[in-house]
Amino acid sequence: MKKILLRIAKFVLIVAVISAVAAGYFMINTTASSKFTVASATENEFYLTAHRGLSSVAPENSAPALEEAGKAGYYAAEFDVMPTKDGVWVMIHDDTVDRTMSGTGEICNLTYAEILEMTIDEGNGIENYPDLKISTLDEALDICEKYSMRAMIEIKGGKSEDMKSVLDILGKRAFEKEPLIIDFDKDRVSAMRELDKNIEIWYLVNKIEDDTIEFAKENSTGIGFNFGIPKNYFRIKDAQSQGITLASWTVDFLPVLDVLCALDVKYITTNRILP
C-alpha cells in the first residue's frame, strides 16, 4: 500500500508542476494539434469530452465549436446553458454576454430576441465566423445528434424550479447516446434527481471531500473533479470503491491524462487533446 501511495504522490507532483508551470503557455497557445493526440498517452480505456465544444479552434459554446468537436470524433461535447429572461435555454458560460458577445447585460435580464440582435465576437477562430449568433439548447442537441456525440450539458444558471424545462426539452427526443447533466450547484442537482431518477448526473467540485462522496451517493450522481487539486488523487479510490463514476476537468496535458487513466478515471474533459 505504501508503494502505491508513493507512486500516486509522484503522479500528484507531476500534475502540480505541470498545472502551475505549463498552464500559462498552453492556455495562451490553444490551437489543437495532432501532437496532442492520445496515442502516446495510454492504452487504457477512457472517453474524451470537448470542453465548451472544441474551443481551441472555434469560439467556446458556439455551434461551430460543437461541429468541430463532432468532426474530430469526440465521445462527448460539454457545453454550458442558462435560461434567458423569457425562459429560453441558451448556450453560454458567463452570467452576462459582455465577455463573448457584442452587447452587454445579464442573461437573466435579456430576452432571447434581444440576445439574437448581438453577435459572438470573442474566441478562438472568431475571424472565420462573422455574424455568429448564440445557439439554443435544442440547436446544440441537434449538432450532437448529427455526429452521434454525447451531449454533456452543464447547467450554469436558473433555479431549482427551472430544471423541469430542461428535462422537457430532453424528453421530446430519442437519443442514440443519452445526454448527461453536470452542475456545481447542489440544489439544482438535487432538484434534477428528484424530477428524473434515471438521467445521468455528475456533481462538479473542485475538491473531493467526504461530503462530496456522501452527496453523490445520496443523489446517485457521478463526480466531476478538478485535476489540478493534488489531494483529489488520494480520494479517487475512496469514491470508486463506493461505485461512484469519476470524471476530471479540464485536462490539456498528456502526462496528466496518463495519470488519470492509470487511476481508472475514464471520463476526461479537455480543451485541446484530440481523440
Locations of regions flagged by a protein language model:
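Phosphate-group recognition and catalysis centered on beta-loop-alpha active-site segments
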Residues: 2-275
